[in-house]
Amino acid sequence: MAVNIYDLAHDLDKGIRETPEFLSLQDAYREVNENADAKAKFERFRDVQVTIQEKQMTGQEIDDETVNVAQEVAQEVQENELIVKLMEKEQAMSTIINDLNRIIMTPLQDLYNVSND
């Protein structure tokens, strides 16, 4: 019986959305967005992250000004309880995603490990 891999992926999507970790992340994100100060700080933090990632991906040097802004914004978000909670929930979801990725990659790892013998 052939397996539709995309159906499995959609089932995984639904399953992830039902995990306690995702539901907690969703609640934490809602709380940040309901607080104007936290929302503004979090958006600024994400903007700085994107700027740094874009510079890294294009091989641009990250200048002192960008580093200083990143440090300033990081300090601000670390002082905001709602954002800290959100980041903790993001870390829990990241762990799950990494575990799932490891499982998904197992067939390829097994294939290449067998062919190396």
UniProtKB/Swiss-Prot annotation:
<comment type="similarity">
    <text>Belongs to the UPF0342 family.</text>
</comment>
<protein>
    <recommendedName>
        <fullName>UPF0342 protein lwe2240</fullName>
    </recommendedName>
</protein>
<dbReference type="Pfam" id="PF06133">
    <property type="entry name" value="Com_YlbF"/>
</dbReference>
<dbReference type="InterPro" id="IPR023378">
    <property type="entry name" value="YheA/YmcA-like_dom_sf"/>
</dbReference>
<dbReference type="InterPro" id="IPR010368">
    <property type="entry name" value="Com_YlbF"/>
</dbReference>
